[in-house]
């Protein structure tokens, strides 16, 4: 099925914990993830790396990609569509670039290796670009751009996914959620942008499906090409690979810029599967694993001037945006990454909200693996 496609909260806004959630200490949750991945058969440091990506999603409030994803990975490891013992391999390399084959290893491990390689190259030459083919779902795109930011570098991270987005004027899903992440050093928080190029992701459709509520108009079109707010119908048809799908960022047609989201999604596809010579969308449905491709680029702002000066300029600009005139009834203007970093501060202190359904899944995984639960 296609349940595993990257999904994000609306506008990448951290979900506020509700009374239905249990707060689990970040330390406890991380320790559980590490135990689980070691028991699945990963080496200790690999288990810690996978846990770090999932924890970052939960801390930033992008819960569709945290503990909630563990059951999906657990099933894929059992099915063999994630290869436990594979290691990503460098196929071609120059001082500023590399092409890697993931051999269907856990996407988080391959992606972290590819971004580390880009970071090393950027430190030596000023710039590093790596592309990956034959990978699997890698979690949140923004994790990898943040890795570079922590080293004082600016960075891009992108991935393709299975077909879910229809082209402008089309009714057949030909593109993925194709997220695009960019991070630039700044204070007190980096500029951390991570967004799908679809209006919404499958996750949002799933939420409306579970709640039995109609979706807002303008998210999806059905097999006839008509706008559709019936979540159960669209959820089923996307999972079946029927005609219809989620609209590009900007929505239907060209009036509100839908062709721009469509163009951005093709750009991500060009930089991932085309450049890495991996599987392009329509081919991704059948065969082994995910056939996901990724793109990473890290560069050193110091190539262009004093890095602390550039960082200060970025910080000042973001502050000016936050200080600018608000519309009536809105107390704050946020900059990308601000809500995520505020969520992280809260969750490190007060624990990570975990939904009851997810807690039940974690208990099931613990029982199956014979490890201590959360």
Which residues make up each language-model segment?
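Catalytic-core signal marking the mid-to-C-terminal active-site face
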Residues: 23-24, 29, 270, 275, ...
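General beta-strand structural signal in soluble alpha/beta enzymes
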Residues: 100-102, 129-134, 155-159, 184, ...
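Phosphate/diphosphate-binding glycine-rich loops and adjacent basic-rich segments that engage nucleotide
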Residues: 165-239
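A glycine-rich phosphate/pyrophosphate-binding beta-strand-loop-alpha-helix module
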Residues: 112, 116, 120-160
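Short, Lys/Arg-enriched N-terminal segments with co-localized hydrophobic residues
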Residues: 1-19
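Active-site cofactor/substrate anionic-group-binding motifs, chiefly glycine-
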Residues: 66-119
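Secondary-shell segments that build the walls of catalytic and ion/ligand-binding clefts
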Residues: 214-283
């Amino acid at each position: 099925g296609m349940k595993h496609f990257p999904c994000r909260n609306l506008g990448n806004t951290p979900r506020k914990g509700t009374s239905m959630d249990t707060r689990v200490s970040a330390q406890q949750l991380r320790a559980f993830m590490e135990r689980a991945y070691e028991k699945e058969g990963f080496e200790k440091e690999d288990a810690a790396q996978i846990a770090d990506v999932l924890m970052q999603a939960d801390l930033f409030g992008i819960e569709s990609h945290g503990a909630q994803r563990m059951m999906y990975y657990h099933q894929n490891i059992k099915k063999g569509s994630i290869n436990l013992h594979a290691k990503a391999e460098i196929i071609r390399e120059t001082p500023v670039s590399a092409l890697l084959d993931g051999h269907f290893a856990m996407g988080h491990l391959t992606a972290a290796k590819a971004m580390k390689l880009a970071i090393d190259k950027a430190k030596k030459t000023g710039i590093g670009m790596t592309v990956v083919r034959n990978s699997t779902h890698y979690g949140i795109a923004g994790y990898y751009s943040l890795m570079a930011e922590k080293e004082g570098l600016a960075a891009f991270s992108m991935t393709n996914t299975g077909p879910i987005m229809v082209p402008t004027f089309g009714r057949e899903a030909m593109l993925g959620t194709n997220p695009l992440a960019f991070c630039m050093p700044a204070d007190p928080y980096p500029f951390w942008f991570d967004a799908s190029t679809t209006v919404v992701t499958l996750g949002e459709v799933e939420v409306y499906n579970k709640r039995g509520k109609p979706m807002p108009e303008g998210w999806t079109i059905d097999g006839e090409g008509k706008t559709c707010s019936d979540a159960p119908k669209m959820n089923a048809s996307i999972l079946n690979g029927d005609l219809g799908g989620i609209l590009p960022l900007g929505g239907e047609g060209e009036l509100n810029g839908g062709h721009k989201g469509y163009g951005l999604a093709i750009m991500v596809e060009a930089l991932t599967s085309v450049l890495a010579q991996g599987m392009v969308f329509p081919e991704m449905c059948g065969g082994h694993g995910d056939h996901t491709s990724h793109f990473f680029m890290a560069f050193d702002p110091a190539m262009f001037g004093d890095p602390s000066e550039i960082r200060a300029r970025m910080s000042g600009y973001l502050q000016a945006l936050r200080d600018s005139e608000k519309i009536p009834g809105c107390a704050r203007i946020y900059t990308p990454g601000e809500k995520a970093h505020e969520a992280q501060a809260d969750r490190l202190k007060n624990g990570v909200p975990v939904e009851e359904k997810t807690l039940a899944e974690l208990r099931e995984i613990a029982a199956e693996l014979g490890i201590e639960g959360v």
